[in-house]
Amino acid sequence: GSTAEVHDNFRNQAGAFAGTMNAIRLFNEHGIQFLINSSFTKRNQAEAPKIYKLVKDLKATAWYLFMIVPTGRGEEIMDELIQESEYEEMLNWHYDMEKEEHDLLVRPTCAPQYYRVVMQRSKEEGEKFKRRTLKFSTGGAKGCLAGQLICLIDVDGNVLPCSYFPKAAGNIREQSFKDIWENSQLFLELRDFKGYKDNCGSCEYVNVCGGCRARAYAMTGDYLAQEPFCSYQPGSSLTKTETTKDSQ
């Protein structure tokens, strides 16, 4: 949140905001670059523009907007997840903000639909949208990277598609990482967009978006199911000319 009242309520811990501000003050005093991560639910989604201003005032190097994946402690706030239509509005707000931002690196995280929004909006506006990158930044080229460009190895040796995905592709104590990465059924399925279901399976943006596989798994029990937070209907962004050609 942008204030102690909102932030401490969201974190469920009095003094959390003051502690964060003190840490940032120390970073600035010693010339240490830092980024700020913000998680958004119904409770604080209206705060995004205010948090953006605060992040700028605090001289952060980057701001990552995390869209909740209801795994782990996230399962406890399932009823606070942002609605599909409001989620879309927030991503469009981010696009407008990022397009005008030249100093701060900004990233919507666990929001693969944003890459579809970028393609849609830039095409509609006839503008090439070049996104900023930093040496330590991840993403920026496509949506969900889980099991495609990234993975995670936990303390027990389990190889997971990402930190939000509880299903393991294998264990490095039992087989080589190379074998897991190249041959595990889970990773192969995540990389095969033809196996994605419902809207994701027929979407023209699946290659750049892919939907959040961890969120699909958490909310439906099927990691190949359509992205639960996406309201886009496949084909709806095609021009009349393109639609006519496809029907001929």
Briefly describe each language-model feature range:
Residues 1-146, 152-156, 168-169:
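Radical SAM enzyme [4Fe-4S]-AdoMet core and its adjacent flexible, acidic
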Residues 149-150, 200:
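Short hydrophobic/aromatic beta-strand element in the GNAT-like acyltransferase core
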Residues 158-159, 163-248:
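Flexible mid-to-C-terminal extensions adjoining Fe-S/redox cofactors in radical SAM and related proteins
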